[in-house]
Amino acid sequence: MCGIFGVWNLDQRPIDIAGVRRATDAIRHRGPDDEGYLLVDTRNTRPISCAGPDTDRRLTIPQIDRYKSEEFDLAFGFRRLAILDLSPGGHQPMASHDGKVWIVFNGEIYNYRELREELAGHGHNFKTTSDTEVILAAYQQWGESCVEHFNGMFALAIWDSAAKKMFAARDRFGEKPFHYVYIPQRLFAFASEMKSLWAAGLAGRRIHEETLALFTQHGQVEIGEQTIYENIQRLPQAYCLTLTADGRLQKRRYWDIDPRERIEGWTDERYAEQFREHFTSSVNLRLRADVPVGSSLSGGLDSSTVVSVINRLLPETAVQKTFSARFDDPSRDEGKWMDLVTQSNRVERNDVWPTAERFFEELERLFWHQEEPFTSSSVYAQWSVMRLAKQNGVTVLLDGPGLEYSL
């Protein structure tokens, strides 16, 4: 995961560069590999790409501290977790070749290779092997409808200096977060995590009482656009937004599932075969990375299926790393089911044993990361699994949440 942040003072007040730095520092944990900034005077000047203390030293761009806040009314901040194209070519914010379009992007476009080939056929040239550059070319080719071409998980924001507008989008299922504050005619700010907005002094922490009531009733906070904090919204899944210099914000849904669509006359065997083909293709696309990829294994049908499919897709000499949470309580532990999976596949097994004592010791840190309330200690178990993967040098984990509803 990467971390993105941006602010646009729609009334052309100067931005607070120190606040931009604080906002980006607040999400350093999302991207330890690189740091970058974009400063823009939307009235007349060319955008300026800037560096911070953690910027890749192979890049020769000026430090953000050289500039004064009163010169700019828009800024982007970025923290990178490098997954595709580990070179400095993947640095963000990234510009189009003509310098007119800039992007900050968190996530991965799984079909970037196919899109790259298609866009090359339209005359686009590429200098890197990153999916970020593909998004920029797609935007220049198809405009805002570019998101309809993406197969992936993403949250992105684009500054179009020629049109003087900002375009933002979130993936079809809301895998990547996009929080924002919008004060008409005055301010628009966005971030991967709300702590960036707090660090920059752009949002408060007053609780939204209706959302809190819904949480106590349903046990969920991601029900609509409203977060549990009064003045912070989330861009819904499969939505994009456009913000123009006159302060107008428009949102639209770019994708949906039509429940009226039906496939009639298929045999059970054909349904199963079609599902198998789509599922295998989906897993295979998610293995595209320039860093180590592992799997989260819970013992359930969902993650067990993912591990088994990966085993068939990898070369015969390759061994995948799995990461699992185990429990002393036999009624909660799924170790025997994990054993069945690991014994029949080429797997290097890694286990972590979360305890109630560790849970309470780390609860404050877990709250800091989660930002909104949750109802199950399984959040802590999953957090422990992710930490174990990091300790073992694995950057990307495939997992099964949601898949059990299909299987």
In which residue ranges do the predicted regions lie?
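Cysteine-centered catalytic environments shared across enzyme families
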Residues: M1-E371, Q382
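Active-site adenylate/phosphate-handling loop in enzymes that bind or generate adenylated species
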Residues: R172, Q185, S384-L407
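Acceptor-substrate binding/catalytic loop of class I
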Residues: P373-S376
